């Protein structure tokens, strides 16, 4: 990709991110689960937007997981356990401007399969 294409790709993601963020908000009972994916790793955190604090997080890099669908499913299972320990059974899924496809979708499906209502 050349520089112009990368700029356009990032600009489109930023526009999607603002559009999504304007419609989502999390609180203590139903936090916002925000995801970030780099080229190599996957991260997620549960955020209480009222207190502006992170309730819990998971770091795929520290756990040795890569940015693949199989690893995203494993991370989803582990993150669902962390959310249940914190007493959370419902959440709002913030895909952070990423398309709901591949790793982002696999993580969300794994959360749903493990009892977290999104």
UniProtKB/Swiss-Prot annotation:
Pfam families in the cross-refs: Ribosomal_L18p
Keyword set includes RNA-binding: yes
CC terms in the record's Gene Ontology section: cytosolic large ribosomal subunit
Disulfide bonds: none
GO molecular function: 5S rRNA binding; structural constituent of ribosome
Key words, A-Z: Ribonucleoprotein, Ribosomal protein, RNA-binding, rRNA-binding
Gene Ontology process terms (BP): translation
Superkingdom, taxonomy of origin: Bacteria
Function recorded in the entry: This is one of the proteins that bind and probably mediate the attachment of the 5S RNA into the large ribosomal subunit, where it forms part of the central protuberance.
Assembly information from the UniProt record: Part of the 50S ribosomal subunit; part of the 5S rRNA/L5/L18/L25 subcomplex. Contacts the 5S and 23S rRNAs.
The family this protein is said to belong to: Belongs to the universal ribosomal protein uL18 family.
Protein name per the record: Large ribosomal subunit protein uL18
Chain's gene name: rplR
